[in-house]
Amino acid sequence: MNGGAERAMRSLPSLGGLALLCCAAAAAAAAVASAASAGNVTGGGGAAGQVDASPGPGLRGEPSHPFPRATAPTAQAPRTGPPRATVHRPLAATSPAQSPETTPLWATAGPSSTTFQAPLGPSPTTPPAAERTSTTSQAPTRPAPTTLSTTTGPAPTTPVATTVPAPTTPRTPTPDLPSSSNSSVLPTPPATEAPSSPPPEYVCNCSVVGSLNVNRCNQTTGQCECRPGYQGLHCETCKEGFYLNYTSGLCQPCDCSPHGALSIPCNSSGKCQCKVGVIGSICDRCQDGYYGFSKNGCLPCQCNNRSASCDALTGACLNCQENSKGNHCEECKEGFYQSPDATKECLRCPCSAVTSTGSCSIKSSELEPECDQCKDGYIGPNCNKCENGYYNFDSICRKCQCHGHVDPVKTPKICKPESGECINCLHNTTGFWCENCLEGYVHDLEGNCIKKEVILPTPEGSTILVSNASLTTSVPTPVINSTFTPTTLQTIFSVSTSENSTSALADVSWTQFNIIILTVIIIVVVLLMGFVGAVYMYREYQNRKLNAPFWTIELKEDNISFSSYHDSIPNADVSGLLEDDGNEVAPNGQLTLTTPIHNYKA
C-alpha cells in the first residue's frame, strides 16, 4: 500500500507538467492568433519579422537533428503586453545515450527569460537509499531548439517555420538509474494544426474620376493606378500644380506663368500667386502702372508721378497730367514752363496768345520766364508793351496812322503810345493824324499839301498868279486911271473872299461835316412836322366852323340820352321847352339857345 501511494505521489509531477503543457499550448495559440491578426510574429530572442530556421545543438555536445518545421506568418505582432513566461515540459530521467528526440519541448511565448521548470522526481525503480547516496551529477546540456507549431492565419504571406531558441537553464543533476521496464515517459500529444483558409479578395475602392481602372490596384498596398494630375491611395486628390474644378469635378492644371507667378502651384480655385505688378488668373500680364513683362516680372512706370499708366510694352506714359508731356511726362506742354524750384511744376506762361506765340522759357540763372517770340507791334519780356510806331488801343497795339508825315529817325515813336496822336507832323500837315494841311496849303491830287495860288486880272487882259501869302502881305500899287481902281480892288477883294471861303471849307473836318448834315436833317424834319400840323388844324377848323354866334353851345355827341331826365320827369313835355318860333335846330345835332329868358317855359 505504501508502494502504491509512493507511485501515486511520483506520478503527480508528470500530471502537473502535462497540465502546464496544455496551458502553454493554449497561451501560444492565443499569441499566434493575435500575431496573425497584426501580421507579424517575433521569434524568441530574434529581431522583429526574422525567422531563425537553424537547428540548435543537441544535448551533451552531440549533433542536433532537424525538427519538423511549423508554418507561421511572417508578420510580427506589436509587443504591447507584459513579458510572457516560458513554460517547460517536465523532463524524465534519461540516460546519457538517450536519443535527442526525447528532448523536452520548450514553448516560448515572448522574449522573457523567466523559466518555470517542473521538479524532477526520482525514478519509481530507484530505491531511496540509492537516491540519498548518489553523488553523480549530470553534465549540463545546451538548450535544444524548440519548434513552435502554429496554424496559418488568413494573411496572404507564405508560412515559414519559426525557430525559437530556448534560454540556457542549468539542469538539476539526476543520478544515473538503471533502466527499468516500470519507468516510462509519458508521450507528448501531437499538436493539431487548424486548416488554412484562402485569402479573401482585396477591395480596391479606386476613384472613378482619378484612376485608370476602378477595379485594379496593388493587392499588397492597395495603391490605385492614377490618371495624370491625381494622387492618393485611391487617386482621390489633385497633384501639386493641379486644382479641382468644381464645375467639371476634374483636376485641371494650374498653368501658372513661370515669369509672373511666385510659385507654380495655385490655390483651390485655380488662381496663381502673382509677383508684384503682375495680374491675371495665371499671372501672365502687367497691371496698370507697370510694363515690360519678363522673367523678372513687371517694372513700374516712370512717369514722374504725372500719370498712372503706361504702354505695357514700351513703358511710354499715357495721359500725362499737370500740363506735362513726353514719354515719361518730363516736359511741359506749349504755353507752360517748368518752375525752377524743387517741385518742377508746369506753370502757365505769362504770355498772351494775342501778343505772342504763347510759349515761353526760363533760363537757369533767372527766376521769371520770357516769351519766346512776340508778334508785330509788341515788345517786352512778356510782350505786353507796344513797339515804336504803334499805340495802345483797347489793349491792342495798332500802327500809328500818320500817313508817312512823321520822320521815324527824328521821332522813333511816331505817335503817342497811349493815344496814337502823331508827333511832329511834316510836309506842311497838321492834325491828330497829320491828315490836314497847314493854313495856306491845300491837298493836291496825290494828297500832298501845296501852297494856294490866286489868279489876278491885268489891264492888258492877261492874268497874274499870286499866292495867298502874297495877297495877304502885299499892297496893290495905285494907278492913274481912277475908274479902273475900284474895279481892280473889287476883283481882288472878291477873289480874296472866295479864297478864304474855300480855305474855310477845307479846314472843316469830316466829323463837323456830319454834324452839319445831321442838323440840317433835323431842321427839315421839324419844318415838315410844323407844316403837317398847320394843315391838320386848318382842316379841323373848316370841319367845325359854325354859323351861330360865339356863345353857342356845341354838342359833340349826336345821340344824347335823356333817359335820366325822362325818369325824373315822366310827364314832362320836351317839345315845350323851346319856342317853336324862336329856336332852330342847328346842324350836326347842335342845340342853339337864344338869349331871351322868356323863351323858356316853367
UniProtKB/Swiss-Prot annotation:
Signal peptide location: 1-30
Key words, A-Z: Disulfide bond, Glycoprotein, Laminin EGF-like domain, Membrane, Repeat, Signal, Transmembrane, Transmembrane helix
InterPro entries: EGF-like_dom, Laminin/Netrin_ECM, LE_dom, LMN_ATRN_NET-like_EGF
Top-level taxon of origin: Eukaryota
Disulfide cross-links: C204-C217, C206-C224, C226-C235, C238-C251, C254-C266, C256-C272, C274-C283, C286-C298, C301-C310, C303-C317, C320-C329, C332-C346, C349-C360, C351-C371, C374-C383, C386-C397, C400-C415, C402-C422, C425-C434, C437-C449
Membrane topology: Single-pass type I membrane protein
Positions of glycan attachment: N40, N182, N205, N218, N245, N267, N305, N428, N468, N481, N500
Segments of this protein annotated with the region Disordered: 38-199
GO cellular component, one term: membrane
Cytoplasmic side: 536-602
Residues passing through the membrane, by range: 515-535
Domain Laminin EGF-like per the UniProt entry, residue ranges: 204-253, 254-300, 301-348, 349-399, 400-451
One Pfam entry name: EGF_laminin
Name under which the protein is recorded: Multiple epidermal growth factor-like domains protein 9
Gene designation: MEGF9
